[in-house]
């Protein structure tokens, strides 16, 4: 997957918004029943570029990236400037049988899956670094497959950087020429992909 280009002229204000989907049914008595439609929030992001320089190809790079995704059709990777790495993040506990575990991230006490790692993560069992390929492999959606089931009670953790798989919210992108060779964009919005667990 392609990585969203963060160019020098990006506005410092990047908005992020968790979005849930809840069905609410009300009985004739007024009693409500709520049903969560997904286990994880869908994240909405918005940003804009205050300055894009045509002379160094920034306008062309952003336009080409957007067109390569075919607007809201394609999935790409976004690295949130604040939430993009973990250190010694616990992602599971061995039970002696399971060999497949999903990497996760913590936002305070809230845990959610990491669907795309940015580089080779460091995987640890009880604080001891394991060897990739020999002890485990990491799949494209952040799942760790161990070659042997971690012993019951062993703590699994990881350190590394991650991306958020997203798609554009719209099929059009607005560029505005503000001066000769200088451009800016309107608000660019994208939404995270929610994968089955």
Q: Where on the chain are the PLM-derived regions?
A:
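Solvent-exposed edge beta-strands and adjacent loop segments
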Residues: 1-69, 164-185
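Beta-strand-rich interaction surfaces with strong enrichment in secreted/lumenal proteins
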Residues: 34-35, 89-90, 146-148
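Surface-exposed coil/turn segments at beta-strand junctions on protein surfaces, enriched
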Residues: 40, 96, 139, 149-151, ...
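A generic structural signal for beta-strand entry/edge sites
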Residues: 42-44, 98-100, 139-143
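Exposed beta-strand and adjacent loop surfaces of beta-rich binding modules
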Residues: 44, 118-122, 153-155
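Extended beta-strand solenoid/passenger and fiber regions
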Residues: 60-134, 160-197
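A surface-exposed beta-strand-loop module
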Residues: 129-154
């Amino acid at each position: 997957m392609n990585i969203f280009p963060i160019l020098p002229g990006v506005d410092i204000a990047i908005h992020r918004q968790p979005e849930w989907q809840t069905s609410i049914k009300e009985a004739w008595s007024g009693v409500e029943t709520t049903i969560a439609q997904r286990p994880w929030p869908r994240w909405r992001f918005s940003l804009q570029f205050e300055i894009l320089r045509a002379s160094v190809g920034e306008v062309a790079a952003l336009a080409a990236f957007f067109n390569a995704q075919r607007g809201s059709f394609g999935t790409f990777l976004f690295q949130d400037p604040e939430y993009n790495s973990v250190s010694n993040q616990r992602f599971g506990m061995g039970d002696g049988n399971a060999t497949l575990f999903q990497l996760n991230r913590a936002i305070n006490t809230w845990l959610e899956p990491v669907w795309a790692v940015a580089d080779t993560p460091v995987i640890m069992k009880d604080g001891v670094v394991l060897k990739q390929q020999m002890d485990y492999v990491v799949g494209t959606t952040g799942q760790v497959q161990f070659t042997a089931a971690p012993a019951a009670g062993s703590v699994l953790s990881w350190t590394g950087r991650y991306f958020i798989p997203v798609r554009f919210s719209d099929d059009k992108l607005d560029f505005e020429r503000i001066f000769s060779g200088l451009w800016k964009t309107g608000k660019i919005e994208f939404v995270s992909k929610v994968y089955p667990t």
